[in-house]
């Protein structure tokens, strides 16, 4: 009897309940059939090195993410929950994933200092021996702090990312995803996606707040159709932002302000408040529960605490439900009569 060879894909299917729970904790849902189809077919056909049996390599996951988060019609917003869950399993692996993690890359060796040349034996000469001096080297970074150049060895961005320098060519388009790998991708391909991550892990594993920049909001608005024209496309965009960026309550209001009209925002908020669950899990009509779960004024939720993050997770889920509810417009009977 031959033994069955375990693969990353087969492992996830054997532990499917844990995979679904991991996705649910991130505010998304995944389905087993689509999970298999993406891994065995669609991601393989992207020609970025994704193996048919799946992988927990962050390099492969990052390559697939670049395709999924591509701007405009080239992206795949419906695949965001799946690749996000793959990344979560790779970066915070449960015990059954650890044996299948690729070995860590060896650190790049530091260049060895040049060994000093042996001094020549003393010989008599008619001329004095002068020491050889090298010409002074220019500094790697300009001394002017206002210079647009940055130190490419710096791994962490400044606390409030400001405007970026002019790009070599082509329009700037938005990007998404986790810090270290995304920083490297952005340096290699600066016109790909936005780097804003309102909530990210800081020192001592504490969440650190990074707001959206004006350029992020501008790019999302200018590269996507308005809600009135294509509500599904804009809803998919906002869903990918909610999943990957995990914005705070203030960030959500800023996002709605930038991407929706005043009437559209009112409709979205109204639909979202209709979906607030009660104690039995069904939509409630109790005003105090609705105001506490989906407030219209800024709540006192601390994203650095588990309770605050849970409030924000539910708020983002309800906001997405409100977008989908607002996208379902009632039939205009007057227009139907005109067509008939």
Swiss-Prot record:
SUPFAM superfamilies: Retroviral matrix proteins, Retrovirus capsid protein, N-terminal core domain. A motif (LYPX(n)L motif) lies at residues 126-130. One of its GO terms (biological process) is viral budding via host ESCRT complex. Pfam families: Gag_MA, Gag_p12, Gag_p30. A motif (PPXY motif) lies at residues 157-160. GO terms for molecular function: RNA binding; structural constituent of virion. InterPro entries: G_retro_matrix (IPR000840), G_retro_matrix_sf (IPR036946), Gag_p12 (IPR002079), Gag_P30 (IPR003036), Retrov_capsid_N (IPR008919), Retroviral_Gag-Pol_poly (IPR050462), Retrovr_matrix (IPR010999). The record marks 127-128, 197-198 as: Cleavage. Disulfide bonds: none annotated. The keyword GTP-binding does not apply. Residues 100-119, 136-146 have a biased composition (Pro residues). Residues 120-132 have a biased composition (Low complexity). A lipid is attached at residue 2 (N-myristoyl glycine). GO terms for cellular component: host cell plasma membrane; membrane; viral capsid. Residues 97-208 are annotated as: Disordered. A motif (PTAP/PSAP motif) lies at residues 118-121. It comes from the Viruses. The keyword RNA-binding applies. This protein is synthesized as a Gag-Kit-Pol polyprotein. This is Gag polyprotein.
